[in-house]
Amino acid sequence: MGSGIAQVFARSGYDVILVDVSEDILRRALQSIESGPYGLIRLVEKGKMSEEEMKKCMQRIKTSTSYESLKDVDFLIECVPENLELKRKVFAELDKICKKEAIFASNTSGIMISSLAVAVERKDKFIGMHWFNPAPVMRLIEVVRGAMTSEETFQITMELSRKLGKVPIPVNDGPGFFTTRFITAWLMEAIRLYELGIAGIKEIDEMCKLAFGFPMGPFELMDLIGLDTILHIAEYMYEETKEKHYAPSPTLKKLVFSGYLGDKRSKLGSKGGWYDFFQVKK
């Protein structure tokens, strides 16, 4: 997700510093931005961008494995895995490094913003900015105000989202916000229907697309997002709400524990997703 967000910012004329834990991951991120399924080369091929514009766009993106490279940024977006303690640790370290004026935004898909903001001093400059996959294509950004998010931080984030060509919609803080609460229940129910033998993976995907006009079905969507991410979200939602429709599916756990983390093109080290594990032809 981070590489897609970086692509959106760079294409909108912003200088970007992309930070990750290894040079190999960063190399793959740049490769995805340039030649991935939603990359810049595709835009050139479709006539939506010139080769010169693509070159300038790529030049706006710098990479680093050090948090020190972020010390002068104005706006920071965190995209680490959906793990509360990991996110808090990252923000606590960044809070010591980044200038005090910098706004911190989390791309968490469901962890309460107020529970993340406890890790930093700048609670008034902390906000949720929930993007959707694939970031270069999906227009919605869910903007989440924490308990101490200032009006200025909120307005800056809303306006920035619009400048990026996105549609920001404000929501209140709570486990899963709106979209994740809604979609997690849908995804877990789709898996349960498969487990009950009501319909197959491909058939469920096709019915959701044909009946509801969705661009992709639940199993295709889970493969795109990442099955490990979906599992983390479901576990968090169930732990926070104790509502049974969020309970993680045993089948989902089996795939994740077997190394099937989703689409191999976007998930480093994954053996594949639902269609690969069950050998279903698309």
PLM features: what roles do these ranges have?
Residues 103-173, 180-181:
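Rossmann-fold dinucleotide-binding core
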Residues 39, 139-140, 186-190, 217, ...:
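A general alpha-helix detector
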